[in-house]
Curated annotation (Swiss-Prot):
<dbReference type="GO" id="GO:0031410">
    <property type="term" value="C:cytoplasmic vesicle"/>
</dbReference>
<keyword id="KW-0813">Transport</keyword>
<keyword id="KW-0833">Ubl conjugation pathway</keyword>
<keyword id="KW-0472">Membrane</keyword>
<protein>
    <recommendedName>
        <fullName>Autophagy-related protein 8</fullName>
    </recommendedName>
</protein>
<keyword id="KW-0449">Lipoprotein</keyword>
<dbReference type="InterPro" id="IPR029071">
    <property type="entry name" value="Ubiquitin-like_domsf"/>
</dbReference>
<keyword id="KW-0653">Protein transport</keyword>
<dbReference type="GO" id="GO:0015031">
    <property type="term" value="P:protein transport"/>
</dbReference>
<dbReference type="Pfam" id="PF02991">
    <property type="entry name" value="ATG8"/>
</dbReference>
<keyword id="KW-0072">Autophagy</keyword>
<keyword id="KW-0926">Vacuole</keyword>
<dbReference type="GO" id="GO:0006914">
    <property type="term" value="P:autophagy"/>
</dbReference>
<feature type="site" description="Cleavage; by ATG4">
    <location>
        <begin position="116"/>
        <end position="117"/>
    </location>
</feature>
<keyword id="KW-0968">Cytoplasmic vesicle</keyword>
<feature type="lipid moiety-binding region" description="Phosphatidylethanolamine amidated glycine">
    <location>
        <position position="116"/>
    </location>
</feature>
<dbReference type="InterPro" id="IPR004241">
    <property type="entry name" value="Atg8-like"/>
</dbReference>
Length: 125
């Protein structure tokens, strides 16, 4: 899935911005959070986040849920490189594993499990 942020901002500018952010805020992770285009879940009000390194994926999902005002009975899924990261994982761990070459971590969210693969889980038949 293509990132709208990547389409709107050239690579060198994104890389310079991520580098500046990481240099200025050592304990924060630069994250771009965007909605999966086909999803009927609400659009988020901003895409760029500076996330504390010690935040868990589950806590970040809570932040997204609050920003889009999603009721607790509605499902939300987040994807990093088409994988559902474990909710107990630290954002710093996910960042180190999946950060883009420009220095940002790209996260997509959806109301449906559109990609469907859990990290570290293989389907057996």
């Amino acid at each position: 899935m293509r990132s709208q942020f990547k389409d709107e901002h050239p690579f060198e500018r994104r890389k310079a911005e991520a580098s500046r952010i990481r240099g200025k805020f050592l304990d924060r992770i630069p994250v771009i959070c965007e909605k999966v285009e086909e999803s009927d879940i609400p659009e988020i009000d901003k895409r760029k986040y500076l996330v504390p390194s010690d935040l868990t994926v589950g806590q970040f999902v809570y932040v997204i849920r609050k920003r889009i005002q999603l009721p607790s009975e509605k499902a939300i899924f987040i994807f990093v490189n088409d994988i559902l990261p474990p909710t107990a994982s630290l954002m710093s761990t996910i960042y180190e594993q999946y950060k883009d070459e420009d220095g940002f971590l790209y996260i997509l969210y959806s109301g449906e499990n559109t990609f469907g693969q859990l990290e570290g889980v293989e389907e057996t038949l």
